[in-house]
Amino acid sequence: EYVGTIVEKGESVATLDVGDFVIGSFMLSDGTCEICEAGYPSRCANAGTYTGSQAQYMRVELADGSLVKVPGGQPDDPDKLADYLAASDVLGTGWYAAVAANAGPGKTIAVVGDGAVGLCAVLAAKTLGADKVIIFSRHGDRAALAREFGADIVIAERGEDGAAKVKELTNGYGAHGVCEAVGTQESMDQALASVRPGGYVG
């Protein structure tokens, strides 16, 4: 994941210019294949992962589909660069989870995981209009940040007890959608146990 300023561009680059401040992830995408057009650029049929962003300069293939131009250019304050860096991975991943969980008005969304991706999923679910956001968290500082980002309820319980708590808060049904933001079998089990029949797990 990286941010940077374009210092040179190839002839095939059509949407970016020298001097543009851009955000990139560790994935390349052409932005034109059927998978990209469906909204899944990290699974591009014609690209994949790459490395090299720790270097001072790097060449980014498929730049039009892989880089996002930041309006307004590079911030004057160097300390703000880290804010943009979050958009290269954790914010997009959390946003994707909330979209895949079908977050929106009238929905209750649960978030499994209180790390950076989970916290961004809370922020995304609220931004997408979810009525209620529940997060599983046992860490006081992260729970406080989750509330600041829009979480309405924090659940410390895990496993069957955690799923029972979600169901108790949703008239016995379970959440309309669950954002799984850990990546373990246990966290996926928690997500599946907490979602209602016909619900979504992102």
Task: Describe each region flagged by the PLM.
Residues 1-37, 71-77:
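Glycine-rich beta-strand-centered segment in the early N-terminal region that forms part
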Residues 4-6, 19, 33, 58, ...:
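Buried hydrophobic positions in well-ordered alpha/beta secondary-structure cores of metabolic enzymes
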Residues 30-112:
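NAD(P)H dinucleotide-binding glycine-rich loop of Rossmann-like/cofactor-binding domains
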Residues 107, 199-200:
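Glycine-centered, small-residue-biased loops immediately flanking beta-strands
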Residues 111-114, 126-190:
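Adenosine-nucleotide cofactor-binding segment
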Residues 118-119:
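N-terminal Rossmann-fold NAD(P) dinucleotide-binding loop
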Residues 195-197:
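Helix-to-beta-strand junctions that scaffold the AdoMet/dcAdoMet cofactor pocket
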